[in-house]
Amino acid sequence: MDPIPLAVMADWWNSIQKGATEAAETTRLVSLRTKLQAEVMYVESQIKGALQKFGVEVFPHMENNNSAQVQQHFVDVKREVDGYREQIAAKNVEIAELNTQIENVGKDAAVAAN
């Protein structure tokens, strides 16, 4: 049996190193994406809580036909919910960027740019 040429062994070793590096990078990116997805879920729960609180606080005013209080509560909660929705939109942009990076792990820079 002939010995394996050094060039073949070097190529094999480089391939293993490249694969390990790509796996580590993919793991890093996926963990960042998972963190952002958890943050989105948390903010969505904040929205749900704000809407539930709104219902509890507004119901008595609606029973008493106090439209000014109802309107004020609505304005306050809408502002809060809009802020949460902006946070979610920003996190979703980051998630989309991470998805693109994950898809491009291991691709040549020229191929990834296309």
Language-model segment annotations:
Residues V8-L32, S67:
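Short, charge-rich amphipathic alpha-helices with coiled-coil/heptad character
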Residues N14, M41, S45-K48, V75-A89:
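Generic structural signal for well-ordered, non-transmembrane alpha-helical segments
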Residues E25-Q46, D82:
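Short, charge/polar-rich alpha-helical segments
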Residues T27, H61-N65, I102:
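Secondary-structure edge/capping motif, primarily at the C-terminal ends of alpha-helices
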Residues R33-L36, V77, K91, I95-L98:
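Long, non-membrane, amphipathic alpha-helices that form coiled-coils
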Residues V40-E57, V93:
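Amphipathic, heptad-repeat alpha-helices with coiled-coil/zipper character that mediate oligomerization
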Residues L51-K78:
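Short E/K-rich amphipathic alpha-helical oligomerization segments
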Residues Q87, K91-N114:
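Long amphipathic alpha-helical coiled-coil segments
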